[in-house]
């Protein structure tokens, strides 16, 4: 399911051009438009999930494996020495896009 009003759905599904670094049937990984650090990337599921409580366990596990794959690639290519893996859930936790 996609949400036509969700900016991340539009980015993940190609409705808006992106700096994509990886894509498969379930996810698109893009470089952040305003990166906080070198290699700042967003792992976007192609299906709409407002928060971690809506995503099924299988897709969540795939996202974790993909995060490791992307971080390993960035370590090798960009020389990144450390990583932040962030997933904000809820407005009080800093979530601004509910995807």
Range-by-range predicted roles:
Residues 1-99:
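HIT superfamily nucleotide-processing domains
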């Amino acid at each position: 399911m996609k949400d036509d009003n969700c900016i991340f759905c539009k980015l993940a599904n190609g409705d808006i051009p992106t700096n994509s670094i990886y894509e498969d049937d379930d996810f698109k990984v893009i470089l952040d438009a305003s990166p906080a650090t070198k290699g700042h990337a967003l792992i976007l599921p192609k299906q709409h999930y407002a928060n971690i409580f809506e995503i099924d366990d299988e897709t969540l596990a795939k996202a974790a494996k993909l995060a490791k794959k992307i971080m390993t690639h960035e370590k090798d290519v960009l020389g990144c020495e450390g990583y932040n893996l962030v997933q904000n859930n809820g407005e009080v936790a800093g979530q601004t896009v509910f995807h």
